[in-house]
Amino acid sequence: MKRAVMLAGTLVAIWSVMPLVPVAAQGRTYVSSNCTRFAIRPSYILFTCADGGFYMTQGEWAGWHRYRAVGSALFHRNDCTPSCAGGTFHTMRGRIVLHDRERCPDAHRHRQVFTRAIITLDVRLLGHVRYRAHLQCLL
């Protein structure tokens, strides 16, 4: 009995000094949808925050889980020919897989966000073209 009381007291002492994990960190996983806000199952994701040259619209998600999200969308990509300012946007259907969950800093309420995307585009004459994108916490 004495041993059980000491064990319970020790556990309470340990738990009281442990840092608390925010509730948001334990639950849902978000993605930076437009470089300024988080979303779950967004229909729009901007992959290139600097110039807006690669983004998706009409996103539909077949699955959205803590560690992986899978969906399809229309992807719009600037060919940057002759330059990115004078380039042409091409639209293609494709699939997206979000993965690599990380916690954003305090300013973002410790939210868990997907930081990697694998995008497979259905390109005429070329078949499937795969891109990898790095997503980040909000700017």
Regions found by a protein language model. Name each.
Residues W15-Y30:
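C-terminal region of N-terminal signal peptides and the immediate post-cleavage residues
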Residues V70-L139:
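Extracytosolic low-complexity repeat regions of secreted or lipid-anchored proteins
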Residues M1, A13, G59-A62:
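Short, low-complexity intrinsically disordered segments
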Residues A8-S16:
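Bacterial N-terminal signal peptides
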Residues M1-A8:
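Bacterial N-terminal signal peptides that target proteins for export
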Residues Y30-G71:
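Short, surface-exposed binding/anchoring microloops in extracellular/periplasmic proteins
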